[in-house]
């Protein structure tokens, strides 16, 4: 076979391969675009019809204001509760990978990643809701914190493991303690991976419904102010609305879904952009 013919065959194979990969990639992302388009198409009319009332009003007024505030409150509290534990667990798994506790920590985190979230809700219900005698934002946040923890911890451990060992050795050579090396050297070098894990964890808990059924309670007529009282959330409200036979409630559910999508994009896209190499945090 001549070199020219061999090169031609190779180019044809490359183009076929690229075409197949491109087609499969398009096939994989089509459902995502379909979901986004459906949410915008069905959710935008109800928002345009009711205007600001849909964003700020209570459920009886035709709005989802308390649910929006409840989602933000639950996500913030869950991050506040779960982030320190998750970071420390990830750092410990990185620093002591071969110890019994280190291996047990990694195994437990992997199990928690796949653990049914509804069981987390029932666990927190028995531990906190039943003794308190009421649903509360605190109980919902605790359930969400347990869900957030493994995501942040695993990403933290993996991000730290990718830092070249020369930086760790350099820290020890300068006389730094183990804690100083981990928190001031390794963490700084791995900050993008750690922040990515935090974002993924926050996105996960902000969209959770199952654990909130047993913990948060759902409250949509007043804005939440006390973490010890019941609270609503957008995913929980959507779940409630879609069970109704009313077409108007279904339209509200689509509008709530669009609002939640906008909140996600408004928060996470700028932060993801800030994680690029050319922008310093």
Swiss-Prot record:
InterPro entries linked: MetI-like, MetI-like_sf, Phosphate_PstA, Phosphate_transprt_permease
Ranges for domain ABC transmembrane type-1: 68-271
Pfam families per the UniProt record, alphabetical: BPD_transp_1
Record localization: Cell membrane
GO molecular function: phosphate transmembrane transporter activity
Principal localisation: membrane
Topology relative to the membrane: Multi-pass membrane protein
GO cellular component terms, A-Z: plasma membrane
Residue intervals passing through the bilayer: 16-36, 68-88, 107-127, 128-148, 194-214, 251-271
Transmembrane found in the keyword field: yes
Keyword Transmembrane helix: yes
GO biological process: phosphate ion transmembrane transport
Superkingdom of the organism of origin: Archaea
Keywords from the UniProt entry: Cell membrane, Membrane, Phosphate transport, Transmembrane, Transmembrane helix, Transport
Similarity comment: Belongs to the binding-protein-dependent transport system permease family. CysTW subfamily.
Function of the protein: Part of the binding-protein-dependent transport system for phosphate; probably responsible for the translocation of the substrate across the membrane.
NCBIfam families: 3a0107s02c
Name of the featured protein: Probable phosphate transport system permease protein PstA
